[in-house]
């Protein structure tokens, strides 16, 4: 099965299914000498793991990561890093009622059309459970970026349904179960999620992530633009249906004199571009947003078909997130870190000796 690897110089390959015995990742390209431990990875995994609040899936997975290779005496060796997380709370019987039907809005139908077969237990390989390994691999990239290069990655969920963040305090996102930067909206979010659970339904969300301290010059021309890789990274996350870089789709209503990020010797006057110009980092804050659809795993009956094309009605049982965006922030941050470290290594490989004609202006 192709499509299980991401990155060029810093590459992560994941494996495993939602209801299989374990999930795993192979991380290639991490420079040697980086101090790293299972505890470093666990901090990020604990932010993503299921069952941590009553507003997410009640599947309880400890998501305890094991480093199998590539680390010796607390430092990366420069060789392949092997990571493993065991699944411990599968309830495959919850999915026996959909073994012969396709859940509308899920990958059941398309996987069967592609492979002629599917793992119906929790979505198998198409489950968001896979993203645990992205977070583990991304934690390695994140620590390198922070420790070696001083790059700070952060983000949060800025909208769930019609509840929007009106103030943005990114230092508070880990203080509430929604990763929401506007704590005044938390009661409204609690009411919304409780109502969705009562109705057996779900809702979409918007997640935004940022990177401060990225120097100018990262990214490759044309097909390997850094914003193109960011878009691919975010679109590869389950349920993501749209990605914005900088002002994104708002540029439709902007005039040229509004959108262009004017420059002075003292720095940029705006950041509509989201820190990327011509596919190459500008030195400004990188800003990426994504829209996540409402999950189709709901208790409201829906029309579908069976394995032989016959009409069927589907009700999805099991333990599911009423809003998948609630746990998406650590995943998006991890993918941002992976893209940035990959492009840092690519840039260093070709352009390490390049000296620009003048110092970069402040972002």
Swiss-Prot record:
FMN binds at residues 125-127, 238-239, 278, 293-297, 319. GO terms for cellular component: cytosol. It catalyses: 5-O-(1-carboxyvinyl)-3-phosphoshikimate = chorismate + phosphate. Pathway: Metabolic intermediate biosynthesis; chorismate biosynthesis; chorismate from D-erythrose 4-phosphate and phosphoenolpyruvate: step 7/7. Its cofactor is FMNH2. Keywords: Amino-acid biosynthesis, Aromatic amino acid biosynthesis, FAD, Flavoprotein, FMN, Lyase, NADP. CDD domains: Chorismate_synthase. GO terms for molecular function: chorismate synthase activity; FMN binding. One of its GO terms (biological process) is chorismate biosynthetic process. Pfam families: Chorismate_synt (PF01264). NADP(+) binds at residues 48, 54. It comes from the Bacteria. It is an enzyme of class 4 (lyase). Its EC number is 4.2.3.5. Reduced FMN (FMNH(2)). InterPro entries: Chorismate_synth (IPR000453), Chorismate_synth_AroC_sf (IPR035904), Chorismate_synthase_CS (IPR020541). Homotetramer. Belongs to the chorismate synthase family. This reaction introduces a second double bond into the aromatic ring system. This is Chorismate synthase. It comes from Alcanivorax borkumensis (strain ATCC 700651 / DSM 11573 / NCIMB 13689 / SK2). The gene is aroC.
């Amino acid at each position: 099965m192709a499509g299980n690897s991401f990155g060029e110089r810093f590459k992560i390959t994941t494996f495993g299914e939602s209801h299989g015995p374990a999930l795993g990742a192979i991380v290639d390209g991490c420079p040697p000498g980086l101090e790293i431990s299972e505890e470093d990875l666990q901090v990020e995994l604990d932010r993503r793991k299921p069952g941590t609040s009553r507003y997410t899936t009640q599947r309880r997975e400890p998501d305890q990561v094991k480093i199998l290779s590539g680390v010796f005496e607390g430092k990366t060796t420069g060789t392949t890093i092997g990571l493993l997380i065991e699944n411990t709370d599968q309830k495959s019987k919850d999915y026996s009622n959909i073994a012969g039907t396709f859940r509308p809005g899920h990958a059941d139908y398309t996987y069967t059309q592609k492979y002629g077969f599917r793992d119906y237990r929790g979505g198998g390989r198409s489950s968001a459970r896979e993203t645990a390994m992205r977070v583990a691999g991304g934690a390695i990239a994140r620590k390198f970026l922070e420790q070696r290069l001083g790059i700070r990655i952060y983000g949060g969920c800025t909208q769930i349904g019609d509840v929007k963040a009106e103030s943005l305090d990114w230092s508070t996102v880990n203080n509430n179960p929604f990763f929401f930067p506007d704590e005044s909206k938390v009661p409204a979010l609690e009411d919304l999620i409780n109502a969705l659970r009562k109705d057996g339904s779900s809702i979409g969300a918007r997640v935004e992530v940022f990177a401060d301290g990225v120097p100018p010059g990262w990214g490759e021309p044309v097909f390997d633009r850094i914003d193109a890789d960011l878009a691919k990274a975010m679109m590869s996350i389950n349920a993501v249906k749209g990605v914005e870089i900088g002002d994104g789709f708002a540029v439709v209503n902007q005039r040229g004199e509004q959108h262009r990020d004017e420059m002075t010797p003292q720095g940029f006057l705006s950041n509509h571009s989201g820190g990327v110009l011509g596919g190459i980092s500008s030195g400004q804050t990188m800003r990426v947003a994504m829209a996540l659809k409402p999950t189709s795993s709901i208790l409201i009956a829906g029309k579908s078909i069976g394995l032989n094309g016959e009409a069927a009605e589907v009700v999805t049982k099991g333990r599911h997130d009423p809003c998948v965006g609630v746990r998406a922030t650590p995943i998006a941050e991890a993918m941002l870190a992976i893209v940035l470290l990959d492009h840092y290594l690519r840039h260093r490989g070709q352009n390490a000796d390049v000296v620009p004609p003048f110092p970069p202006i402040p972002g």
